[in-house]
Amino acid sequence: MLTVRHLFALAVAVGFATSCGASNRAGPQSPAGDQLNVAETFIDRLYAFDSAELNAMLGTAADSIPSISFYQGWAEGGHSQVVQRRPCEATGPQRVSCSITVQDDLMLALGIDFNVTDTFTLSFAEGEIASVATSSNALQVFWNAQEWVNEEHPELIGVPCQGMFDGGLTPGECVRAMVEGYARFAVSTDFPEASALLQPANRN
């Protein structure tokens, strides 16, 4: 039979074990968890359209600043609205991927009911962002439109799109010029038949 003394000792032991378990669970976060938090903050700042806050996060990823800064200005100028934000995912020991689906003026100008998903792949070194790469599931017609504008209406984009996604200073003006060009493409005889509009891009 357990005596009062035994019961007291058992209660103390159980309490100590529980306390230790809770302490372990509340311990320092894993490096992967830290990277996920940083990546989520990166997405927050990217779509808050605050370039100073975004660039502050990219101090250790200087080579990525020209493209990401332009992307941010392009997204703001094109009225990008987040339709679906998936949680960022660790895709490697030092890599996190974040996929964001947006609606913007470019696809609206083409008259296509399709929202593009942009994926940002962040590489880390010593807990800091080392680089950011981007990819997209934009349809083939999107790239056809861009090529058409380049060839048929270079006057629209010649000045505002200098340094496009490579440090250009007027991303907002650039995307607005592209929207105008895309709208012209949509009413041109070069615009694809409806059956071809949702064709995936072939960028090989």
Positions of predicted regions on the chain:
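Bacterial N-terminal signal peptides that target proteins for export
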Residues: 1-8
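Bacterial N-terminal signal peptides
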Residues: 9-18
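Short, well-ordered alpha-helical segments enriched in acidic and aromatic residues
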Residues: 46-64
